[in-house]
Amino acid sequence: MVIQSTEIVDTFAEAFKMWGSRMVITAENEKWALAAGRSVTGFATSVIGCKCEAGIEAELAPDWTPDGRPGVSVLLFGFSPDGVGKRLLERIGQCVMTCPTTACFNGLEGGERVVVGGKLRYFGDGYQASKLVGDRRLWRIPVMEGEFLIDESFGVQPAVGGGNILILGRDARTTLEAAEAAAEVMRIPGVILPFPDGIVRSGSKPGSKYKALPASTNDAYCPSLRGSAPKTALPEDVRCVLEIVIDGLTEASVRESMRRGIRAAARDGIVQISAGNYGGNLGQYKIRLNELVQGAA
């Protein structure tokens, strides 16, 4: 299949079962809400090296937050509810509670529950107090600035991680411009792109010649290794490859994000759009690119 002059490779992205949670972080103004959002999602690009994957889902107007203040919604993904709970506790404690004027609320009503505020409250050293709002229990933790308000527990639900597209271009500038255009339209509700501004240049493959490494450079897609690596997946005129990885709360949201990205990236100078997979042996989801483009998302 071809869009404009770009070939959509007849292949699939291999995605994985994960667990996801949503934080709603509010603050006195947008500046501090974003500061907390950026901090809590730092070093969270891949579960391989970061224990979780996280990103800002959206900026929220006061009408859309529990306390009527500006906010951000943040999605965080891991391999188990317990793992997600641990990462929430660590990151909220170090990156949200520390940020001036913030509060942190659960953004998922369904799924399983993990205790977060109910554990973080002990930072209050006995001075913490609970607060009931309807059937919602929150904790007021005294801090030097005033109080930090947080939900006792957060929802965790089954999710999908590792959706991806590979953008193969004739030169670095054209490829980056296509990836930027794709990333911009791929940010939809229920989805994050966990890498820097959504784009990955150092795609990986499982395993390595070095036993200590669980992953290593995806040599089949490295233009500089054409001719020296055992095999290449690159057409002769490809000089740059960039990847976009997608995590979502549902398979449907990941598929829709990928569909939008493929259409946005296709243009002159982009030779192919492909996807990373492991032969269907590791992931539980196989998302075929041609089906997405044909509208069967």
Report the location of each language-model feature.
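Conserved mixed alpha/beta catalytic, RNA-binding, or beta-rich assembly cores of soluble enzyme
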Residues: 2-62, 81, 86, 90-241, ...
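Extended, highly charged
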Residues: 74-75
